[in-house]
Amino acid sequence: MLYEAVQGLNITPVGIYVDVTFGGGGHSKEIINHLSADGRLFAFDQDQEAFENQLEDHRFHLIEGNFSDIKRHLKFHGITAVDGILADFGVSSSQFDSGKRGFSTRFDGPLDMRMSHSGQLDASQVINEYPFEAVSYTHLRAHE
């Protein structure tokens, strides 16, 4: 799916693109391969572990934060329009491959489930401290 997703962007070599879910960097690496020296790629991730995958390339800018702030961050960089946006929503496979984040069903670990460690509320607090009705309502809303 990586190549198909990037192909769907119909990349212009001098274009400006955004990967709003950087994660392991696979999509961003493929986008960079299609850009000329004048093309630019901005990527977002709120998971600090994603920064271990940062690309060392003058055309690439990794922004720590949620893509909901895309307009503000791009404006800061002088960008008012982009040629394409890629979003691969969901949990990163690296978050499933370890028990330490609380997403894995294969490994024991804390019930955390935060996309960013900077978030103050983790899943354990919700399960153990919220009233049953609130947790039930949250679960039902997620499955509508």
For the regions a language model picked out, list residue spans one by one.
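SAM cofactor-binding core of SAM-dependent methyltransferases
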Residues: I16-R72
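A short acidic, Gly/Pro-enriched loop at the edge of an enzyme's catalytic core
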Residues: L74-G84
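Short amphipathic alpha-helical segments
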Residues: L55-E56, K75, D97-K100
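A mobile, often basic/glycine-rich helix-loop segment
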Residues: D83-A87, V91-N128, F132
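Conserved alpha-helix/loop element of class I SAM-dependent methyltransferases that forms part
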Residues: M1-P13
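Conserved small/polar residues in nucleotide/adenosyl-binding loops
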Residues: T138-E144
